[in-house]
A protein has these predicted regions:
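Conserved small/polar residues in nucleotide/adenosyl-binding loops
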Residues: 307-314
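Accessory alpha-helical/coil subdomains and C-terminal extensions
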Residues: 48-50, 56-65, 91-231
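Short, ordered loop/turn segments at secondary-structure junctions
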Residues: 18-19, 51-52, 77-83, 155-157, ...
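C-terminal catalytic subdomain
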Residues: 204-205, 210-217, 223-275
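A glycine-rich phosphate-binding loop feature that marks nucleotide/adenosyl-phosphate handling sites
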Residues: 122-129, 236-240, 275-285
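Glycine-rich oxoanion-binding loops at beta->alpha junctions
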Residues: 1-43, 53, 106
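Short glycine/threonine-rich loop-to-helix capping motif typified by GTGT followed
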Residues: 191-195, 242-252, 282-294
Length: 318
């Protein structure tokens, strides 16, 4: 097998699914069917790659294996651009997506400088409840770029009046601005910002609302109330499939966590998730460990508010 080629093969080769397993107490029949298929195919090792929902699947399958006395080993392998898995330092996929977002934001900022009058560009970034990807927009700040003007994470309640006041304040200085918003920002009553406009809701198999439209809603509001030329940009699928921006560290660590999962399963472990443990910042180094899936499944690691500051042009994010 050509490992180097495998490392650079799009994950779409493996396929994906969005299927939520029921609780064992509510539907044993579904689990019986799954285990029958695994037994018929003589599958003894089951590796599931993904984020929170995937780890929930590993938890349920490994629990059922214990209940029924099955010797199949179930291991979770972390992979999510959301970076919201508990325990692990970070997740493979996040670094590449963050790299794409930082570079894209810098290019959008440059584009806005072409105008000699104030404009607003609102960029909507993935992140339902955790704002790690949106916070990555702060990485656009560098010696040759002042960075984005405002960043809004789902960890904080979104105040529309305060938002409009900040936009008006920046526009009064006569310059264009770029704003990064998480798709999952909510107002005080718990509604997503995109729900403030007429919207047909779509809910996936895990009960998650399809999030999109917050940037467009805010852009329309700014245009209507402040009369400023405003555009909304949804990075959408691009932030998770931009292979030209893949992080080398991501490739290495994805390979490492996969290999660690196989090794652990062969050594008899089950109901575990491989995690990355940082042992050094300079030079950067992470090692792999395994952790009980019950301490990870359905637990979201959110951005600590201590990381935030009033202005993303400061060292911290807004």
């Amino acid at each position: 097998m050509d490992i180097d080629l495998l490392k650079r093969t799009p994950s779409s080769y493996l396929g994906s699914c969005r299927y939520k397993l029921p609780e064992i107490s509510e539907d044993r029949e579904t689990f019986d069917k799954i285990f029958k298929i695994l037994d018929d195919l003589d599958i003894k090792y089951f590796f599931y790659i993904g984020g929170n929902d995937s780890m929930d699947t590993i938890k349920k399958l490994s629990d059922y294996a214990i209940v029924t006395g099955s010797d199949i080993k179930f291991m979770g392998v972390p992979k999510t651009i959301d970076n919201d898995l508990a325990v692990t330092d970070h997740t493979p996929g996040f670094g590449s997506a963050a790299k794409f977002i930082a570079a894209t934001m810098k290019e959008i900022i440059r584009d806005g400088l072409v105008y000699d009058y104030p404009t607003v560009t609102i960029v909507e970034i993935m992140g339902r409840n955790a704002g790690w990807l949106t916070a990555a927009a702060a990485l656009a700040k560098s010696d040759d770029c002042e960075g984005v003007d405002l960043i809004y994470l789902p960890e904080k309640v979104f105040d529309i009046d305060h938002f409009m006041a900040r936009v008006k304040e920046i526009a009064a200085k006569g310059r264009s601005m770029v704003i990064a918003v998480s798709e999952g920002i909510k107002v005080a009553d718990g509604r997503y910002v995109f729900e403030l406009s007429e919207h047909v809701e779509f809910v996936d198999a895990f009960g998650h609302k399809q999030l999109a439209g917050s940037a467009k809603f805010l852009a329309n509001k700014i245009g209507a109330e402040l009369g400023i030329k405003t555009r909304a940009i949804e990075l959408s699928t691009l932030q998770r499939c931009a292979a030209h921006m893949t992080s080398r560290t991501d490739i290495t660590e994805a390979y490492n966590v996969g290999g660690a999962a196989v090794k652990a399963a062969f050594e008899g472990e089950t109901g575990k998730v491989v995690v990355l443990k940082r042992v050094s910042d300079d030079p950067y180094m992470c090692i792999t460990e395994t952790n009980d899936v019950h301490q990870i499944a359905n637990i979201e690691k959110k951005v600590c508010l201590l990381y935030t500051s009033p202005s993303p042009r400061d060292p911290k994010t807004s």
